[in-house]
Amino acid sequence: MRKNLLLITILIYGSFLFSQDPEILFNQANDRMKKGELEQADSLLKESLKIDPSFAPAHIGFSELWLRKGDLVKANESATKAVQMDEEFRSWWNGLNDIRTRIQNGKRNVQQGQFDVAMQEYQAIVDKFPYFPEAQFYMGLTKFRHKDIEAAAFYFSEALKIYPGHQKARKGLNNVTKQLLNNGNKAYKRGDLEKASEYYLKAVQFDKTFYLAFYQLGVLEKKMGNSEQAIDYFNKAIKIKPDFHKAWFTLGTSYEVDNNLDSAIVKYNKAIELNPGYTKAYGNLGNIYTLVEVYDSAKDVLLTAIQIDPTYADGHLRLGVVFSQQELFFEASEQFKKATEYDEKNHDAWFRYASSLNSIEKFLEASQAAQKCIDIKTKFGGGWYEKVVAEFGKGNKTMALKYFDEANKYRDWRKLAQRKIDEINNPTKYEK
């Protein structure tokens, strides 16, 4: 029994001594660095220097660690310490000096407009030190100054593949992908959806975390009627940035277009949870509740919307629709009136305002509202129809017949207009 205990003690003690060997810790750190596990390598190198502060290879290890992070100054400091302890490492120090010289040469060549020569200098660094992200960064910067933003994006992204924490490369890539996004947005506004898509796709090709480009791809696909693809892109944007309320909202609109109203409600509520002041989400949510005839819920969310923003014209408009559906035309007219005050160019608001006024027999105001609708959108039968109703209500049969001719031109309003004109011409037919 004593022999067994002694053997176990020897093994444990031997293992402890083995783990305390700075050479072993240094080798473990090198293995970690090659795998990109730089924080673990840092801990192992620190441990080796605790055991033996004069262990020069650990300082070389730190020098390489800093080089992998793109910090040539700190890499040189650690290399200098190693050389002071052991001249054997002078060649490594010289290699760092060569990097510094080539970077200076590259910068000078860029200033002189010799971009190809600068790229050769940086490529020479990459060939010798492929894990040094700063070289890829300078290649990206050279391409950026040469106005080749796609090549710049490639090199910035390569630097980040080597070391994701490289802040200058991250900033450079952000600048480039934002340019691609802006170019895409300009193409989108011009109506060139194919070109816009190309720019957005390039942005996410170089930066798979660029949620705004995924969002814009979703908007584009939605506009083209590709609902499934749009939803996929919106979900990608949300996966990257879960608190992006606009993506939740626009995802909701995609589900609403597909008549998947339950899913749309969930997405709108999520948008509201993330941004309680986002009135558009309340407006769309109220619209769905109106469609499914849950009027109390519709009123609640729409009243909340106009409390948040009393000038939210669409909120007043939709609240007016809720009241109209319940045949509360006076209340509806008050909301439609506010909608026209806050959005004077909305023909639909003027049309609905005229309709509600006709329903409560305020024919003079209804005629004026209908005329506003007609002035804004002449080729809309609804405005002409409400004008017919208003003029007839005022007792102006001649004008009503005149406006009937206009209303009768529009297929969607023809049946109603013809019934109304028959009522004008044959009043006894409609007497109760």
Task: State where each predicted segment sits.
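Helix-start (N-cap) detector for alpha-helical repeat units in TPR-like alpha-solenoids
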Residues: P22-E23, A56-P57, R90, I99, ...
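Structural signature of tandem alpha-helical TPR/SEL1-like repeats
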Residues: K35-L44, K69-K81, N109-E121, H146-E158, ...
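Terminal, low-structured helical/coil segments at or just beyond the last alpha-helical repeat
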Residues: N105-R108, R170, N175, Q179-G191, ...
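Alpha-helical adaptor scaffolds
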Residues: D98, K107, V321, Q325, ...
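Structural marker of alpha-solenoid helical repeat scaffolds
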Residues: I51, M85, K128, I162, ...
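Canonical tetratricopeptide repeat
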Residues: N27, G61, G95-L96, Q104, ...
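N-terminal leader/linker segments that initiate helical-solenoid repeat arrays
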Residues: L17-K46, K50-D52, A56-P57, R68, ...
